[in-house]
Amino acid sequence: MPNTLDLHSLIPTIGLSTNATVSPSNGIATDFSNPVTFTVTNNTASAIYTVKVTAIGKPTAVFVSLPASMNELNSEELTACKWMLQNIPNSLYASFTDIKNGTVDLSECKVIWWHYHKDGGVDGKEAFERSAPEAVNAAVALRDYYNNGGSFLFTRYATNMPAEIGAVANNAAPNNCWGQNEADAEKVSGPWNFFIQGHTSHPLFQNLIMKSGEPNSIYTCDANYRITNSTAQWHIGTDWGGYDNLNKWRTETGAQDLAYGGDGAVVAWEFPATGTKGKILCIGSGCYDWYSVDDVPAFYHNNIAKMTQNAFNYLMNH
């Protein structure tokens, strides 16, 4: 938790199954200055959980999003955020309003991650600015962070954000975007993948679970996984979109392509560090998905967490 919060009076929100109760009571101001023990009871069964809250003054990594509290994130975003808090040391959640107002001390922050999901998709720069005004309002503070060496991981529709902080040479955003609703997400019949030919040695793609005989394919989900196919990519081709080929896209945007869809669209890319500026990694592939409505045993889906860990390592240490 940010050290600006009073640990002596935090209000816990605890999810309980039907007929279960918890003591101390849920939703009541509680003193977390020391570890707190909660007892959950359901009929004759009971379990004891100890919660320790750590106050963080200067985070190393921040998951940023639109709501004031991470409890207000949708399921896709919340799953990603919880993973970060559990796996990236000295990390915390902050809202864009927190960033704008300077509530969070970013002086030692190496990476800010925004994973943005919106049911139905976010198609185009104007649609992005309408759907995420809090992010746009924080652009000045984020630009200062970036210009002073701070790095970003932008995933899904957050890949529109580099244009808002002056990172894209032509001020453009992904030109080929769509997505489904979480509640009626598509059930895949087999694993989905994207392609990394020419970039297999990039740190983002190391130590993943690979399919035998397919060194250029990254698989990210398993059969029966429910996926919204939420995509924010760059169409490349002479038919439409303004980027006849990859060289033109690279020259006009200043970005470097890292991964591709089956039609050659750019689905992962980066803006290398230049001068005093930090690095930016973007993943806009519909295959990059954290949450399935139906619980499915994970094999290839473990690549999502591993790839994200790789991203943090790359942005923090290279």
Task: Name every feature range the model reports, one short phrase each.
Residues 1-59:
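Beta-rich interaction/scaffold domains
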Residues 60-62, 281:
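Conserved beta-strand elements of the Class I
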Residues 62, 66, 70-171:
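Helical hinge/lid and interdomain linker segments adjacent to catalytic or ligand-binding clefts
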Residues 68-69, 118-119, 159-161, 264-265, ...:
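Short, solvent-exposed loop/turn segments at secondary-structure junctions
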Residues 124-229:
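A glycine-rich, often tryptophan-bearing local segment used as a flexible ligand/cofactor-contacting loop or short
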Residues 186-285:
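Catalytic beta-strand/loop cores that center a nucleophilic Ser/Cys/Thr
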Residues 289-308:
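A short acidic/glycine-rich loop-to-helix N-cap element
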Residues 310-318:
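C-terminal alpha-helix
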